[in-house]
């Protein structure tokens, strides 16, 4: 009686363990695209929107995949000089188009309404307003702002 119970327990243990191992998604480690050949022609820089590098060991070749403005993907050899030049240009353009975190935070504070506003009036000539705004990463408090 004990042997079948132990075997059943062992079976459930192995089954429980294998569910966790086999349930791991393959897509976590697999790239979305693999390149098996490269374009032989230079793509006009004006048609490109972005790029991604393919460096996975699951793909036969390391590659750069350029994404065109029409959302087409084109494989290119990362060792080619024109590919490296295009990557630098796209990186430079990306840096210009994205505002820095400081500017994003400042504009978010200016454009959003305060979360907690307390208004108090002392007199008509000397009004005092207290604002207390809290965001996920920054806390700004302005107290005793006199408005004439």
Swiss-Prot record:
Copy out the induction comment: By platelet-derived growth factor. Up-regulated upon hypertonic conditions. Up-regulated in the dopamine D1 and D2 receptor-containing neurons of nucleus accumbens shell after spinal nerve ligation.
- What are the annotated glycosylation sites? 126
Gene it is expressed from: Ccl2
Q: Which InterPro entries match?
A: Chemokine_b/g/d, Chemokine_CC_CS, Chemokine_IL8-like_dom, Interleukin_8-like_sf
* Quaternary assembly: Monomer or homodimer; in equilibrium. Is tethered on endothelial cells by glycosaminoglycan (GAG) side chains of proteoglycans. Interacts with TNFAIP6 (via Link domain).
Question: What are the UniProt keywords, alphabetically?
Answer: Chemotaxis, Cytokine, Disulfide bond, Glycoprotein, Inflammatory response, Pyrrolidone carboxylic acid, Secreted, Signal
Q: Which Gene Ontology molecular function entries are recorded, alphabetically?
A: CCR2 chemokine receptor binding; chemoattractant activity; chemokine activity; cytokine activity; G protein-coupled receptor binding; heparin binding
According to its UniProt record, where is this protein located? Secreted
Gene Ontology biological process terms, A to Z: angiogenesis; animal organ regeneration; astrocyte cell migration; cellular response to ATP; cellular response to dexamethasone stimulus; cellular response to estradiol stimulus; cellular response to fatty acid; cellular response to glucose stimulus
Provide the Gene Ontology terms for cellular component.
axon terminus; C-fiber; dendrite; endocytic vesicle; extracellular space; perikaryon; perinuclear region of cytoplasm
Answer yes or no on keyword Lipid metabolism.
no
User: What is the stated purpose of this protein?
Assistant: Acts as a ligand for C-C chemokine receptor CCR2. Signals through binding and activation of CCR2 and induces a strong chemotactic response and mobilization of intracellular calcium ions. Exhibits a chemotactic activity for monocytes and basophils but not neutrophils or eosinophils. Plays an important role in mediating peripheral nerve injury-induced neuropathic pain. Increases NMDA-mediated synaptic transmission in both dopamine D1 and D2 receptor-containing neurons, which may be caused by MAPK/ERK-dependent phosphorylation of GRIN2B/NMDAR2B.
Pyrrolidone carboxylic acid found at: 24
> Matching CDD domains, A to Z?
Chemokine_CC (cd00272)
Q: Which residues cross the membrane?
A: none
Bridged cysteine pairs (disulfide): 34-59, 35-75
Tell me its family. Belongs to the intercrine beta (chemokine CC) family.
Query: What name appears for this protein in its UniProt entry?
Result: C-C motif chemokine 2
Answer whether the UniProt record assigns the keyword Repressor to this protein: no
Q: What PTMs does it carry?
A: Processing at the N-terminus can regulate receptor and target cell selectivity. Deletion of the N-terminal residue converts it from an activator of basophil to an eosinophil chemoattractant. N-Glycosylated.
């Amino acid at each position: 009686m004990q042997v079948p119970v132990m075997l059943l327990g062992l079976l459930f243990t192995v089954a429980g363990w294998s569910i966790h191992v086999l349930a791991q998604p393959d897509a976590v480690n697999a790239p979305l695209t693999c390149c098996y050949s490269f374009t032989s022609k230079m793509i006009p820089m004006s048609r490109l929107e972005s790029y991604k590098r393919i460096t996975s060991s699951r793909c036969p070749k390391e590659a750069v995949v350029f994404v065109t403005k029409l959302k087409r993907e084109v494989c290119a050899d990362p060792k080619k000089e024109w590919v490296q030049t295009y990557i630098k240009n796209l990186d430079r353009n990306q840096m210009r188009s994205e505002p820095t975190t400081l500017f994003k935070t400042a504009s978010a504070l200016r454009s959003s309404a305060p979360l907690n506003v307390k208004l108090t009036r002392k007199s008509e000539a000397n009004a005092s307003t207290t604002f207390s705004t809290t965001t996920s990463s920054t806390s700004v408090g302005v107290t005793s702002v006199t408005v004439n």
